[in-house]
């Protein structure tokens, strides 16, 4: 019983560390990914994305899109 409780706690700690590392990697970049907020002046989208003038977030770049 004690062993299974320790495994559950250990699993939750690993899950928390993994999500924290992913969030740190995401915010550490100087550009925004899909649906990240942007304004085109101080915050920019990563390559492959364009800043939507209507919604002010990054969307997939495709031919014909401004």
UniProtKB/Swiss-Prot annotation:
Expressed by the venom gland. SUPFAM superfamilies: omega toxin-like. It is found in: Secreted. Keywords: Amidation, Disulfide bond, Ion channel impairing toxin, Knottin, Secreted, Signal, Toxin. The modification Proline amide is found at residue 63. InterPro entries: Huwentoxin-1, Huwentoxin_CS1. Residues 1-21 form the signal peptide. GO terms for molecular function: ion channel inhibitor activity; toxin activity. Its main location: secreted. Residues 22-29 form a propeptide. Disulfide bonds join 31-46, 38-51, 45-58. One of its GO terms (cellular component) is extracellular region. Probable ion channel inhibitor. Several genes are coding for U1-theraphotoxin-Cg1a for which the structure by NMR has been determined. The cross-references to PDB can be found in entry JZT7A_CHIJI (AC P0C2X7). Belongs to the neurotoxin 10 (Hwtx-1) family. 46 (Jztx-7/10/12) subfamily. The presence of a 'disulfide through disulfide knot' structurally defines this protein as a knottin. This is U1-theraphotoxin-Cg1a 2. The lineage of its organism: Eukaryota, Metazoa, Ecdysozoa, Arthropoda, Chelicerata.
């Amino acid at each position: 019983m004690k062993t299974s409780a320790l495994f559950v706690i250990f699993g939750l700690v690993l899950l928390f560390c993994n999500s924290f590392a992913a969030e740190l990697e995401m915010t550490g970049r100087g550009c925004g990914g899909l649906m990240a907020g942007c304004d085109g002046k101080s915050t920019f989208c990563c390559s492959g994305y364009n800043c939507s003038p209507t919604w002010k977030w990054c969307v997939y770049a495709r031919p014909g899109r401004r």
